[in-house]
């Protein structure tokens, strides 16, 4: 007779099912149930990747919507179409409320459960990086004091992650590389510091290249993919400093993307 799955196993299975169906809001709900049922135990690598993928898709859809609406708003403003601009601003505000709610949800979970229960170096860096990412997403659309606060929280989280990564993870470790990628994007996009962005990305790339021969087969694909993204951004940013380019800046891919 088959052993009945535990509630944890059932929720993980349902999260995978929701992912296949591209129902990411429900995937978030299932993975939050897993996270909240753990006590002081930490998520497995598979579970934390599922949680990350769920939230990345939910937030990613809204970030894309916000960028499209903001671009339309700028065009209508330049045409002096005030009536349309007012409608667009209202709609943008609705998307921003959704973005805030999603970020607040994962940030609460990270602070209350995931970061305190993280035991290994890679899980600490993973969750602190995640904390930095979601504060950065807030900084993308917040203004004034709220933007300043979100940017400061991003910097604090990324720096804490970086301190652990440089002492506990190899330069070729995908999580360390992903952190360097997103931290450099933060310097470039949020702090408007292209020099610091390029220095951080170049240092991470050079350190990984120097140890490429030590890479294990299981993380080779993930690491080299992120290294390529670091190089793409460096190319884009150095050309942008010479002219005003508008190509897409690359961020750390979702865990499932890195494995394809």
From Swiss-Prot:
Family matches, as Gene3D superfamilies: 14-3-3 domain
SUPFAM superfamilies listed in its UniProt record: 14-3-3 protein
InterPro entries hit by this protein: 14-3-3, 14-3-3_CS, 14-3-3_dom_sf, 14-3-3_domain
GO CC terms in record: cytoplasm
GO process annotations (BP): protein localization; signal transduction
Family under the similarity heading: Belongs to the 14-3-3 family.
Protein name: 14-3-3-like protein C
Species annotation: Nicotiana tabacum
């Amino acid at each position: 007779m088959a052993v009945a799955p535990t509630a944890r196993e059932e929720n993980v299975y349902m999260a995978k099912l929701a992912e296949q169906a591209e129902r990411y809001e429900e995937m978030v709900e299932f993975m939050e149930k897993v996270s909240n049922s753990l006590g002081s135990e930490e998520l497995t690598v598979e579970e934390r990747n599922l949680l990350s993928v769920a939230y990345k898709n939910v937030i990613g859809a809204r970030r894309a919507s916000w960028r499209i609406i903001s671009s339309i708003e700028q065009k209508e403003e330049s045409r002096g179409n005030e009536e349309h601009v007012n409608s667009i601003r209202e709609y943008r505000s609705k998307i921003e409320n959704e973005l805030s709610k999603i970020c607040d949800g994962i940030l609460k979970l990270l602070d209350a459960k995931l970061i305190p229960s993280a035991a290994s170096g890679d899980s600490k860096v993973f969750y602190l990086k995640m904390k930095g990412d979601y504060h950065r997403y807030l900084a993308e659309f917040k203004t004034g004091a709220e933007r300043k606060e979100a940017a400061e929280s991003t910097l604090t989280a990324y720096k804490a992650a970086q301190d652990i990564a440089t002492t506990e993870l190899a330069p070729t470790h995908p999580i360390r590389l992903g952190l360097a990628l997103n931290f450099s994007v933060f310097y470039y996009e949020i702090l408007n510091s292209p020099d610091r962005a390029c220095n951080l990305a170049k240092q991470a790339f050079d350190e990984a290249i120097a140890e490429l021969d030590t890479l294990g087969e299981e993380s080779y694909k993930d690491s080299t993919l992120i290294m390529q993204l670091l190089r793409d951004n460096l190319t884009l940013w150095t050309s942008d400093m010479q002219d005003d380019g508008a190509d897409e800046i690359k961020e750390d891919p979702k865990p499932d993307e890195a494995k394809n």
